[in-house]
């Protein structure tokens, strides 16, 4: 398979320093809203990268569930591989690929667990089917067949048919406190625009990077 000729030109225009927000969270929210307004598929989907105790990196796609001045939030099974990695090394990176807009955002930061109240508030807002699925699946554990998972789901669906589903102790969220955010905009002739926000105490510095 020859992939050498698969390429395209970037046509959506550049990114200039004068167009940037002073706060990178504001810049992120601006781009995220534009991705939503453009009807991109899964605009909140992000790659989460972690590292195990041997230094082996792993990536997976999860959905961003909140962003504010403190950080970026996602939820997962606390027994999952990513949660085990975070327990060992809470440095993490996130990546948002908004290909149709010729944009991407790369974030580095530190993960911290959400409070029980934050977990409960979000869990109770989920559809009941999603709540059941969170309990039925012990994420990253080995199972013999899909039928085992489906059987557990149906069992729990019947069990909680007429009542509230308690928040499982092995489920919760993380907030990523950002230390850097890089905004990438595709440019003509591969002269892409890259701006890196780096946290300095309570302030942010902004540097242009070569493509």
From Swiss-Prot:
The secretion signal range is none
* Keyword Oxidoreductase in annotation: yes
Binding-site residues, substrate: 7-10, 65, 122, 126, 130, 190-192
Q: What EC number(s) does this enzyme carry?
A: 1.4.3.5
GO biological process terms on file: pyridoxine biosynthetic process
Q: Does the keyword Chaperone apply?
A: no
Enzyme kind, highest EC tier: oxidoreductase
UniProt similarity note = Belongs to the pyridoxamine 5'-phosphate oxidase family.
Q: Which SUPFAM superfamilies match?
A: FMN-binding split barrel
Co-factor note (free text) = Binds 1 FMN per subunit.
Q: What reaction is this protein's catalytic activity?
A: pyridoxamine 5'-phosphate + O2 + H2O = pyridoxal 5'-phosphate + H2O2 + NH4(+); pyridoxine 5'-phosphate + O2 = pyridoxal 5'-phosphate + H2O2
Native organism: Vibrio cholerae serotype O1 (strain ATCC 39541 / Classical Ogawa 395 / O395)
State its role.
Answer: Catalyzes the oxidation of either pyridoxine 5'-phosphate (PNP) or pyridoxamine 5'-phosphate (PMP) into pyridoxal 5'-phosphate (PLP).
Entry-linked InterPro entries: Pyridox_Oxase (IPR000659), Pyridox_Oxase_CS (IPR019740), Pyridox_Oxase_N (IPR011576), Pyridoxamine_oxidase_dimer_C (IPR019576), Split_barrel_FMN-bd (IPR012349)
Q: Taxonomically, which superkingdom?
A: Bacteria
Which pathway does UniProt place it in?
Cofactor metabolism; pyridoxal 5'-phosphate salvage; pyridoxal 5'-phosphate from pyridoxamine 5'-phosphate: step 1/1; Cofactor metabolism; pyridoxal 5'-phosphate salvage; pyridoxal 5'-phosphate from pyridoxine 5'-phosphate: step 1/1
> Can you state the subunit structure given in the record?
Homodimer.
What is the name listed in the Swiss-Prot or TrEMBL entry for this protein?
Answer: Pyridoxine/pyridoxamine 5'-phosphate oxidase
Query: What's a single GO MF annotation on this record?
Result: FMN binding
Q: Which Pfam families match?
A: PNP_phzG_C, PNPOx_N
Q: Where does FMN bind?
A: 60-65, 75-76, 81-82, 104, 139-140, 184, 194
Enumerate the UniProt keywords alphabetically. Flavoprotein, FMN, Oxidoreductase, Pyridoxine biosynthesis
- Cofactors per UniProt? FMN
């Amino acid at each position: 398979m020859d992939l050498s000729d698969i390429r395209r030109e970037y046509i959506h225009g550049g990114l200039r320093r004068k167009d940037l927000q002073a706060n990178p969270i504001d810049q992120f929210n601006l781009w995220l809203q534009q991705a939503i307004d453009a009807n991109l598929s899964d605009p909140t989907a992000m790659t989460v990268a972690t590292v195990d105790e041997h230094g082996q990196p792993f990536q997976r796609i999860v959905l961003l569930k909140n962003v504010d001045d403190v950080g970026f939030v996602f939820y997962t099974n606390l027994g999952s591989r990513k949660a085990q990695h975070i327990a060992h090394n809470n440095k993490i990176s996130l990546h948002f690929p908004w290909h149709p807009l010729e944009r991407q955002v790369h974030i580095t930061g530190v993960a911290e667990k959400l409070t029980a109240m934050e977990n409960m508030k979000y869990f109770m807002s989920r559809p009941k089917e999603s709540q059941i699925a969170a309990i039925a699946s012990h994420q990253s554990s080995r199972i013999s067949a899909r039928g085992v998972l489906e059987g557990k789901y149906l069992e729990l669906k019947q069990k909680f048919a007429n009542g509230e589903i308690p928040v499982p102790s092995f489920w919760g969220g993380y907030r990523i406190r950002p230390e850097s955010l890089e905004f990438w905009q595709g440019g003509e002739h591969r002269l892409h625009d890259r701006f890196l926000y780096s946290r300095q105490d309570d302030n942010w510095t902004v540097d242009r990077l070569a493509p």
